[in-house]
């Protein structure tokens, strides 16, 4: 669906440039691959602030000294006294709030986070960035958490609805495909008469379609006297 010779950063920048200016405070939510100076500045030019995950090898400047985020977290994690215990969607995390410079970003908030039961574990360390420094720690994490349903939607569409399996060149074609894909997703969630998870609905509909195929083949077999006549009916 896109020219693979063009970088993802360039694609996201082009998308950002086409967005209308938001009428209210709005945020670009992203994973760590898109937290770059170019993308942040492009969205900022359109009126969007950025909230995203951050790689733990990014450089921070705490107290004016250059330090890799993961190394800074190790120094802080000797005790949890510098961390606040925060609850997001019923899950608790120890969070340290840094505000200051990053490479390519003059001023932003960076949150260093550990799950409550994995404090100080380097493998459990997660970091998040917000270019809106006026947001509280809870607000940043709550906004970022809104990304997950969107992420799950796209993953479901890629795995089950062939989102990444088509090459469509026209804008009208893309809009039509998007409409059909969204309708198919909705049918999986609500098409059985009651709301259910996408996975359950998808498997239920798949089973119904498969049973209809078997029923059709069975009817063809009943109406046939030999293999050749069966093939004529079934194919």
Predicted region positions:
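Single, function-defining residue in the core of a domain
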Residues: 1-235
């Amino acid at each position: 669906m896109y020219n693979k010779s063009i970088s993802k950063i360039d694609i996201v920048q082009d998308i950002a440039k086409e967005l209308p200016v938001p009428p209210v405070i709005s945020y670009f939510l992203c994973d760590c691959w898109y937290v770059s100076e170019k993308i942040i500045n492009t969205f900022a030019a359109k009126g969007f602030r950025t909230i995203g995950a951050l790689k733990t090898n990014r450089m921070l400047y705490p107290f004016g000294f250059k330090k890799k985020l993961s190394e800074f977290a190790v120094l802080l994690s000797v005790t949890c006294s510098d961390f606040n215990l925060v609850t997001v969607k019923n899950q608790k995390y120890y969070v340290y709030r840094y505000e200051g410079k990053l490479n390519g970003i003059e001023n932003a908030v960076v949150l260093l986070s550990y799950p409550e039961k994995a404090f100080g574990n380097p493998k459990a360390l997660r970091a998040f960035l917000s270019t809106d420094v006026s947001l509280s720690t809870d607000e940043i994490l709550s906004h970022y958490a809104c990304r997950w349903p969107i992420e799950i939607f796209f993953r479901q569409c890629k795995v089950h609805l062939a989102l990444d399996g088509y090459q469509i060149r026209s804008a009208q074609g893309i809009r039509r495909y998007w409409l059909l894909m969204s309708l198919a997703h909705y049918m999986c969630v609500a098409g059985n008469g009651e709301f259910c998870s996408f996975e359950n609905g998808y498997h239920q509909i798949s089973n119904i379609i498969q049973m209809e195929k078997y029923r059709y083949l069975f009817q063809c077999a009943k109406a046939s006297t030999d293999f050749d006549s069966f093939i004529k009916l079934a194919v």
